[in-house]
Amino acid sequence: MSVVVKICGLSTRDTLEAAVAAGADMVGFVFFPASPRHVGFDLARALGDQVGSRAAKVALTVDASDALLRDVVDALAPDLLQLHGKESPERVRAIRQTFGLPVMKAVAVATADDLAALPAYAAAADRILFDARPPKDALRPGGLGVPFDWALLSGLALPVPYMVSGGITPGNVAEALRVTRAGGIDVSSGVETAPGVKDSELIRSFIRATRASEETMT
């Protein structure tokens, strides 16, 4: 099977080019000032122009207002909106309708109880992203390099595609895919040398490892 690869939190031309050239299907840009991966509108516009149509552009926001989302859409012209906050299924549905763009909702996972709202989110979003639930004192909801128990997703069946993120690296991506059978994988801190500092060789290594794992999946 072909796995959708998303490299998230890109903020420089060089690392963005490395991701696109290596075959990333999606490239993500963070619009959240508390994140070390945050990009402003001018930079987002320049990076979006660099991508062109070579990969899908994803805009990550956290509990954003319609006004902020409109500015994000104007700057990046994203192909997908990633909602990484505590947006309700109703809010997800409203954003999808207002902006006319597909939406991916992040679902934070620590225990099986965290999957209780999954049917409602799967009915509202076009895609689900499972990420590790951050510690209570965390200042941001993702990109912390912490995995969750992938076995919680074993045997999962959803009406929409889903991706997995959280503590995934070139060294464990094959195992993450084997356990979850996810159709997509999302990496941020796993291809960094420091928070927010992407590494081109780690990006290439991650994509190579993901493509190699496809050969063992049916």
Swiss-Prot record:
<comment type="similarity">
    <text>Belongs to the TrpF family.</text>
</comment>
<dbReference type="InterPro" id="IPR011060">
    <property type="entry name" value="RibuloseP-bd_barrel"/>
</dbReference>
<dbReference type="InterPro" id="IPR044643">
    <property type="entry name" value="TrpF_fam"/>
</dbReference>
<keyword id="KW-0057">Aromatic amino acid biosynthesis</keyword>
<keyword id="KW-0028">Amino-acid biosynthesis</keyword>
<dbReference type="GO" id="GO:0000162">
    <property type="term" value="P:L-tryptophan biosynthetic process"/>
</dbReference>
<dbReference type="InterPro" id="IPR001240">
    <property type="entry name" value="PRAI_dom"/>
</dbReference>
<keyword id="KW-0822">Tryptophan biosynthesis</keyword>
<dbReference type="GO" id="GO:0004640">
    <property type="term" value="F:phosphoribosylanthranilate isomerase activity"/>
</dbReference>
<comment type="pathway">
    <text>Amino-acid biosynthesis; L-tryptophan biosynthesis; L-tryptophan from chorismate: step 3/5.</text>
</comment>
<keyword id="KW-0413">Isomerase</keyword>
<dbReference type="InterPro" id="IPR013785">
    <property type="entry name" value="Aldolase_TIM"/>
</dbReference>
<dbReference type="Pfam" id="PF00697">
    <property type="entry name" value="PRAI"/>
</dbReference>
<protein>
    <recommendedName>
        <fullName>N-(5'-phosphoribosyl)anthranilate isomerase</fullName>
        <ecNumber>5.3.1.24</ecNumber>
    </recommendedName>
</protein>
